A protein has these predicted regions:
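Metal-cofactor-dependent catalytic cores
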Residues: 1-152
Length: 152
């Protein structure tokens, strides 16, 4: 029997940040543009780097981080565009998949940065999220991404 938890999930939250100095904010949907990124996102630009177009993170990893650190940091504060539920993201590196109707390719793991550690005011953020900080993906087809979209 196939465990669908590993090959199909859903979009739980969507977040964008207009520039480096602004906080990431939750939105109900976002327009993904092939080769550019997410409309309204600070990294959105012509001929964008493949690995900078959209980022994802698992709510399960966020919950685990909060449990082991004794914190209650909201998912949006993990600075990723899409918070997923019910899908293992690490196994998707090098693969193409869909977020709703938008096709993406996972290029590499999204390693946590020192800015994230400083914003959490936690010593071991980078260590704890090293292999669970999400994915960096390229947008292969344009379209809207909505909360509750299926990831497959």
């Amino acid at each position: 029997m196939i465990c669908y938890k590993h090959i199909m999930g859903k979009v739980l939250e969507i977040g964008i940040s207009e520039n480096k100095s602004s906080k990431i904010v939750n939105v109900n949907d976002v327009e993904a543009i092939k080769g550019k990124g997410l409309v309204g996102e600070k990294h959105f630009k012509e001929n964008n780097k493949k690995r900078c177009q959209i980022t994802l993170i698992e709510i399960e990893n966020i919950n685990h981080y909060n449990k082991i650190t004794g914190t209650h940091i909201p998912a949006i504060n993990f600075l990723r565009n899409i918070v997923t539920e019910g899908i293992r993201l690490n196994v998707l590196v090098g693969k193409e998949f869909f977020i709703g109707k938008v096709k993406v390719r996972a290029h590499d793991l999204c390693r946590p940065c020192k800015n994230l550690q400083e914003s959490f005011q936690q010593k071991n953020t980078v260590e704890e999220l090293l292999y669970t900080g999400g994915l960096r993906c390229e947008i292969l087809s344009s379209g809207k991404i909505f909360i509750d979209d299926i990831i497959k």
